[in-house]
Regions:
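Residues that cap or flank secondary-structure elements
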Residues: 32, 93, 140-141
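Structured beta-strand/loop patches that form or line metal/cofactor-binding pockets in enzymes
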Residues: 1-43, 47-48
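Glycine-rich, aromatic-flanked loop segments that form ligand/cofactor-binding clefts
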Residues: 98-138
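Solvent-exposed alpha-helices and their adjacent loops that cap or buttress functional pockets
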Residues: 29-30, 117-120, 154
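Metal-dependent enolase-superfamily TIM-barrel catalytic cores that perform enediolate-based chemistry
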Residues: 123-124, 128-171
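Conserved residues at the C-terminal ends of beta-strands
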Residues: 2, 52, 163
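Glycine-rich, charged/polar anion/phosphate-binding loops
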Residues: 22-23, 112-113, 146-147
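Metal- or metallocofactor-binding catalytic centers and their adjacent structured scaffolds
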Residues: 5, 24, 40-109
């Protein structure tokens, strides 16, 4: 597992609510941490996964030794055994490992993972998304969300995902 960091500008935790949601905050700088999982085979092939949380990777310590010497192409066997090992946990660490094993399979078979999974589409529609609503001059009103949605539509997006205010009243 490798970690890397980068700086995001104009982004900060929402201090007005719970400190977990990221919101637009002009002038703010936020250091973010990312992770790369690499699984190396005895044949010299490396499977990669980029993403995941610190908690996901902490769980991997429970079953990392199990992976040593296993056939990485036996993804279902590995999945079922690890599922049992993590039966009392949320199993969030299984996804990154599974994707890295699929990456190995793609490299072994000389095909992209989407082909191994039976994919046929050459493109997929994209959508625009927001950070959470805030109260600091970013997406701070329904009108601001509407203006941003119109701007995204002008940029060619045909769908728009809203992350509203976390502290909004439940209706």
């Amino acid at each position: 597992v490798h970690t890397y960091q980068w700086e995001s500008r104009d982004l900060a935790p929402d201090d007005d609510y719970n400190g977990y949601n990221l919101v637009y905050k002009p002038g703010a700088k936020l250091t973010r941490t990312g992770r790369i999982l690499q699984i190396h085979t005895g044949a010299g092939i490396t499977g990669d996964f980029v993403g995941g949380s610190a908690g996901d990777y902490a769980q991997m310590g429970i079953f990392a030794r199990y992976l040593i010497g296993r056939d990485p192409l036996q993804r279902e066997l590995i999945f079922n055994d690890v599922k049992r090992a993590l039966r009392k946990l949320d199993k969030m660490s299984m996804g990154p490992v599974d994707i890295a094993l699929w990456d190995i399979a793609g490299k072994v078979h000389g095909a992209p993972v989407w082909q191994l999974l039976g994919g046929w589409k050459k493109s997929l529609p994209a959508y625009a998304s927001t950070y959470h609503g805030d109260e600091n001059g970013g997406l701070d009103t329904p009108e601001a969300f509407a203006d941003f949605a119109e701007q995204c539509c002008e940029m060619g997006y045909r769908a728009f995902k809203i992350h509203g205010w976390s502290h909004a009243p439940i209706r």
